[in-house]
Amino acid sequence: MKKIIFTLLTIFLFGSVNPVLAQDFDVAAKYAIAIEANTGKILYEKDATQPVEIASISKLITVYLVYEAIEQGKISLTTPVEISDYPYQLTTNSEASNVPLDARNYTVEELLDATLVSSANSAAIALAEKVAGSEKDFVDMMKAKLQEWGIQDATLVNSTGLNNETLGDNIYPGSKKDDENKLSAYDVAIVARNLILKYPQVLEITKKPSSTFAGMTITSTNYMLEDMPAYRGGIDGLKTGTTDKAGDSFVGTTEEKGMRIITVVLNANTQAGNPYSRFTATSNLLDYISSNFALQTIIKQGESYQDSKAPVQDGKEDTVTAVAKEDIQIVQRLGSRVQSSITYSANSQQAAPLEAGTVVGRLTYDDKDLVGQGYVTSDRPSFDMVAEKNVEKAFFLKIWWNNFVRYVNDKL
């Protein structure tokens, strides 16, 4: 693989911007993280790798697996779900947020709405039972999915995030009576990112301040939505979480300045007279992100980078210009003067005939201005580079000669 390395001096001088320095900002929560979803870049973190109770934020994993089952054709939004005695009886427990389930039969779509809008625990359990047959088997699916995402240190005991004390005899085998689901803020960001990127339709539900369930109006627990007490423009999700152990927690998401931002605030610092501490902390964190980071397009779709080319075997032309498959965008700190390298790697094997749009190389951005681990993805940002045009096959005598030269070179 042929590599060409260039150095990019990322200097952002945006007029009169006076960014808040990272060391000067402290989110009002015990644990927190903020990321840009499309790139996976970490923009802020605070004790983000410590596994702690996350309460109903757990339902994001549940919802992901429901959407996955829909994608796989196992169920659909209109599939009826029969409510078993376990989730039905839980609706009478005042310690668990819920909706009435007296009809004992609802669609997947209705239960998704109840789960995401009003954080209905029985709705989540009913979905878990529909997908896996039992909540126990569903929890095993949740664990497997987290392993697939590289999350190794989570504790999962149910599909809802409730404390086991609320569930009576329906607790996960081998778990303790007071166990709760635990993930780190870092891991929650991974969950939220996977959900939003794979199933963006979830935002059509989570952006609703209210919805209708079985003829009654249900209200969102996310008070940052429109017409809610802690409203902030642009917020379209995602999930609250509240237990005695988890405190007031919230995963928020919004698009600001072209960035799809995900914030995780766990165990917000509660203040007397302020029931919206988690939302205030989230808004302050978003202000910090908006003031300190920006999205930059380094190569536009269809453009090459520093005359990037790729070899073509047996073509009328020996090389083809490699261009960006789509806009190549990175997130950088405002005012940063950090040297970061861009590496273009051309694929070594591609033979004519070659069609325009065929991937012929990769562009990798080696970001040096990092917060914590830098990215929630395993690799640094990299992007496909494709052939700018078609390359036809060469005349047979040229191909014969090329093969002869390669044979001689290999044997000598």
Label for each model-derived stretch:
Residues 1-5, 54, 104, 108, ...:
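Structural motif marking the loop-to-transmembrane transition
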Residues 2-23:
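Sec-dependent N-terminal signal peptides of Gram-positive bacterial secreted proteins and lipoproteins
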Residues 8, 41-42, 50-53, 61, ...:
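A broad, structure-centric signal for solvent-exposed, well-ordered loop/edge residues
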Residues 12, 131, 393-394:
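Intrinsically disordered, low-complexity regions enriched in Ser/Pro/Gly/Gln/His and often acidic
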Residues 15-16, 72, 300:
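Residues in and immediately flanking transmembrane alpha helices
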Residues 20-186, 196-199:
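Active-site-adjacent loops and short helices of periplasmic peptidoglycan-processing enzymes
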Residues 168-169, 176-182, 186-412:
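Domain-terminus/edge residues, biased toward the C-terminal soluble/receptor-binding domains
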